[in-house]
């Protein structure tokens, strides 16, 4: 597996490699994330939904605290996904009380690291991935570089999007999740526990997807449909296969109605055809062990957009802070660090780069 000194994948850039540098996460307020739900909550039901603002706090740890306070099992607590530990995150949780007395959440939870913003009832548990997206406010301090070049690159991203790589969070510290995957798929002991197993399978899928996307970025066709392309409809998981590429289809892609896609590997035949499938098979030919491991684990073939559209992207250079400040929205499953890597070479003030709750 190709990686740099930090254990991360070497991936092609959508534009020129960035030369500007900055520090990320000098303080929690420098990395702010707010979850956006895709539906309204009913106000009735056995599930209590809590909107919590957490500061430098692990998502799984907080879920355990909610279970303890409510006297329920951890499985009765829902959250849409893991959020970066190092930052200020506004995140939804749900707790299935099933007739139990509701705790005084504010009294039980309020601390220097957790604030209760809203409590509301709903009829269902919050499922993983059940988000419209996330809003980000990022402050990169000690910025050094050509502001005009950075503004030009950000303008390109605002207009045309950026490669939709999985971020290094998915692969663990120094890529250690990938090392565990390789040992497992090479005949080693399977991971203990459903959580670790799911995390490693997700890392393996993400690695293979990134390999395909990087190859297409290098070929400058990551935003263009190839014959046989499985095109994902914007804002959904649905896709259709284009055996041939005509001007009408290319116009739809230019309008961002649909996007070229790459594989999330699993059982079954890839929906990609012709040139698109041939490229994916060539790129993944050296990873037969990983593909077989994912298939044996029971995962099914899925697709992910190669192109990430960054909504409401705005930026400024606050003079008093010697920094670059970014505000944008991303769909569920996309990574802010994927946007940042195209613009600035960042170093983490808190230590290891871009760590997710683990």
UniProtKB/Swiss-Prot annotation:
Key word Isomerase present: yes
A Pfam family the protein falls into: TruD
Keyword tRNA processing belongs to the record: yes
Catalytic-site annotation from UniProt: 84
Record-listed E.C. numbers: 5.4.99.27
GO biological process, one term: tRNA pseudouridine synthesis
Protein origin, superkingdom: Bacteria
A molecular function (GO) term: RNA binding
Ranges of residues in domain TRUD: 161-312
Gene Ontology CC entries for this record: cytosol
Keywords assigned by UniProt, alphabetized: Isomerase, tRNA processing
Catalysed conversion reaction: uridine(13) in tRNA = pseudouridine(13) in tRNA
Known role: Responsible for synthesis of pseudouridine from uracil-13 in transfer RNAs.
UniProt cross-references to NCBIfam families, sorted A to Z: PRK00984.1-2
The family this protein is said to belong to: Belongs to the pseudouridine synthase TruD family.
Protein name, entry field: tRNA pseudouridine synthase D
């Amino acid at each position: 597996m190709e990686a740099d000194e930090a254990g991360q994948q070497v991936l092609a850039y959508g534009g020129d490699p960035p030369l500007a540098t900055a520090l990320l996460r000098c303080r929690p307020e420098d990395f702010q994330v707010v979850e956006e739900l895709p539906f309204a909550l009913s106000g009735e039901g056995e599930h209590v939904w809590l909107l919590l603002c957490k500061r430098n706090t692990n998502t799984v740890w907080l879920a355990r605290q909610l279970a303890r306070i409510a006297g329920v099992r951890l499985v009765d607590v829902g959250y849409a996904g893991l959020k970066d530990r190092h930052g200020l995150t506004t995140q939804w949780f749900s707790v299935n009380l099933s007739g139990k007395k509701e705790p005084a959440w504010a009294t039980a939870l309020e601390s220097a690291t957790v604030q209760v913003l809203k409590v509301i009832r709903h009829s269902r548990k919050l499922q993983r991935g059940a988000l419209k997206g996330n809003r980000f406010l990022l402050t990169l301090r000690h910025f050094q570089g050509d502001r005009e070049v950075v503004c030009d690159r950000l303008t390109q991203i605002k207009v045309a999007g950026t490669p939709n790589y999985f971020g290094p969070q998915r692969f663990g510290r120094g890529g250690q999740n990938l090392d565990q995957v390789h040992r497992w798929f090479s005949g080693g002991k399977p991971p203990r526990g459903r959580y670790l197993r799911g995390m490693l399978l997700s890392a393996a899928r993400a690695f293979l997807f990134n390999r395909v996307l990087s190859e297409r970025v290098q070929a400058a066709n990551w935003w263009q449909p190839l014959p046989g392309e499985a095109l994902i409809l914007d804002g959904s998981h649905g896709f259709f296969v284009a055996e041939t590429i005509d001007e009408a289809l290319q116009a739809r892609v230019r309008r961002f109605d649909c996007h070229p896609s790459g594989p999330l590997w699993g059982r079954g035949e890839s929906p990609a055809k012709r040139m698109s499938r041939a490229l994916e098979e060539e790129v993944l030919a050296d990873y037969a062990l990983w593909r077989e491991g994912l298939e044996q684990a029971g995962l099914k073939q899925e697709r992910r957009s190669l192109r990430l559209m960054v909504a409401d992207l705005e930026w400024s250079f606050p003079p008093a802070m010697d920094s670059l400040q970014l505000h944008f929205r991303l769909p569920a499953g996309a990574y802010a660090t994927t946007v940042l890597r195209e613009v600035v070479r960042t170093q983490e003030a808190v230590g290891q780069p871009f760590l997710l709750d683990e």
